[in-house]
């Protein structure tokens, strides 16, 4: 039969949207993936539901270039993972506890099976996107202006973020171990590029992509390679010390339990950048099938780039997320007003909070709030310091929180004491 072709102008925003959108921004595959499936006679809906069979068929077609195959496969596996995430099987019903034990056990089994399937899809998406970026005829530097490479970087970053989160849902909110096992794949977690975390327990790894903080004027990010994360450390052992709520007349000469003032708080929420790469792979087949992968955590304050596949690439980072989460979980504004009328026992003595791990090579800026106030008064300034690359490189912020219903001279002495103890 004959096919009639006509031409018409379309809006610029439609053109750009078609070029740049993907399964991450709409319930449809990207135009690049749809084109590959169309020219091979595959249905997008069927391939999204059965990615393994579809990818296996695509591999048998020699006309499909390596970049086309790897990028389409990565998006298909990610599409299936996102579909599973939205399904009822991968969610815990709020009515589950009211059902019989037999039904609860069956639902739990289905829930875990769904998460296992989702983890398998994310594992495949990570591998195919990595192979596209670092093991094709063209390297990343040859595709620097390609929209497709930006899409694949996003697939890679999101797949890592969702893999870590889904693994925590599947195996419970226990402390993060040294590996993540997905079927036959083993992702070993490496903290060599985050010296502070060596030999330290990590309570939680949290992706920051979906975090939004209404009280922050802006979110400070650094564009680059890798998935933006936030690391949560366990509470300090001295958090339950009876000296936290005890008024101490002369803190400079007081003998604290364990020799440390319990009101000095090291940073618990740390910015991190996560990458995933094969431990050893020289071919695309090894990248896709070798079970050994490595998740590397980077300290974005100390590392601006990472060596991936033998070359150095700038690292992404989110510097505002740890500060935003700290503010949200401490509810300091409410405590400030209660302290004014002497109703908050936590503020018998001043507290000092380090917003990042102490770095002796950076100058310390100590911010002290005023009457009936809290460290929330310094949100804009603190976020600006973290957002400016030069200030971030040379300064670190400490926040002091104290009860404002005490005499000014007494408050001044107590604050001076806790600052001195922090440096010691």
Where are these regions (language model features)?
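Sec-dependent N-terminal signal peptides of Gram-negative exported proteins
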Residues: 1-2, 385
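Flexible, membrane-associating and regulatory peripheral segments of lipid-active enzymes
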Residues: 3-365, 374-380, 396-399
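Active-site catalytic motif of lipid deacylating hydrolases and related acyltransferases
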Residues: 362-424
């Amino acid at each position: 039969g004959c096919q009639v072709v006509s031409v018409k102008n379309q809006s610029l925003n439609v053109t750009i949207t078609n070029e740049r959108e993907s399964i991450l921004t709409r319930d449809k595959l990207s135009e690049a993936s749809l084109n590959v499936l169309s020219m091979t006679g595959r249905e997008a809906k069927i391939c999204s539901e059965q990615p393994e069979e579809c990818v296996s068929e695509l591999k048998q077609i020699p006309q499909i270039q390596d970049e086309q195959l790897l990028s389409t496969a990565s998006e298909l596996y990610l599409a299936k993972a996102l579909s599973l995430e939205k399904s009822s099987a991968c969610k815990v019903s709020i009515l589950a506890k009211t059902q019989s034990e037999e039904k609860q056990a069956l639902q739990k089994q289905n829930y875990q099976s769904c998460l296992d399937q989702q983890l398998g899809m994310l594992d495949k998406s990570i591998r195919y996107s990595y192979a596209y970026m670092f093991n094709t005829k063209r390297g990343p530097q040859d595709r620097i202006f390609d929209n497709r490479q930006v899409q694949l970087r996003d697939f890679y970053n999101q797949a890592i973020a969702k893999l870590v989160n889904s693994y925590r849902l599947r195996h419970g909110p226990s402390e993060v171990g040294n590996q993540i096992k997905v079927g036959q794949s083993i992702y070993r977690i490496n903290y060599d590029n985050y010296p502070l975390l060596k030999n330290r327990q990590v309570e939680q790894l949290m992706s920051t992509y979906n975090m939004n903080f209404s009280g922050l004027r802006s979110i400070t990010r650094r564009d680059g390679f890798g998935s933006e994360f936030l690391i949560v450390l366990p509470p300090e052992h001295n958090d339950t010390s009876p000296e936290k709520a005890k008024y101490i007349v002369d803190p400079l000469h007081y003998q604290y339990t364990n020799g440390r003032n319990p009101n000095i708080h090291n940073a618990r929420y740390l910015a991190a950048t996560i990458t995933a790469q094969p431990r050893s792979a020289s071919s695309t087949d090894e990248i896709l099938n070798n079970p050994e992968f490595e998740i590397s955590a980077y300290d974005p304050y100390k590392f601006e780039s990472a060596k991936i596949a033998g070359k150095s690439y700038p690292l992404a980072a989110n510097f505002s997320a740890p500060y935003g989460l700290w503010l949200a979980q401490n509810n300091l504004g409410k405590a400030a007003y209660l302290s004014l009328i002497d109703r908050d026992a936590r503020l018998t003595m001043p507290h000092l909070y380090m917003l990042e791990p102490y770095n002796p090579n950076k100058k310390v800026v100590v911010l002290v709030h005023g009457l009936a106030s809290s460290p929330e008064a310094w949100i804009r300034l603190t976020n600006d310091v973290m957002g400016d690359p030069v200030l971030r490189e040379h300064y670190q912020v400490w926040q002091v929180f104290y009860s404002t219903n005490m005499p000014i001279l007494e408050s001044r002495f107590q604050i001076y004491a806790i600052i001195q103890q922090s440096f010691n």
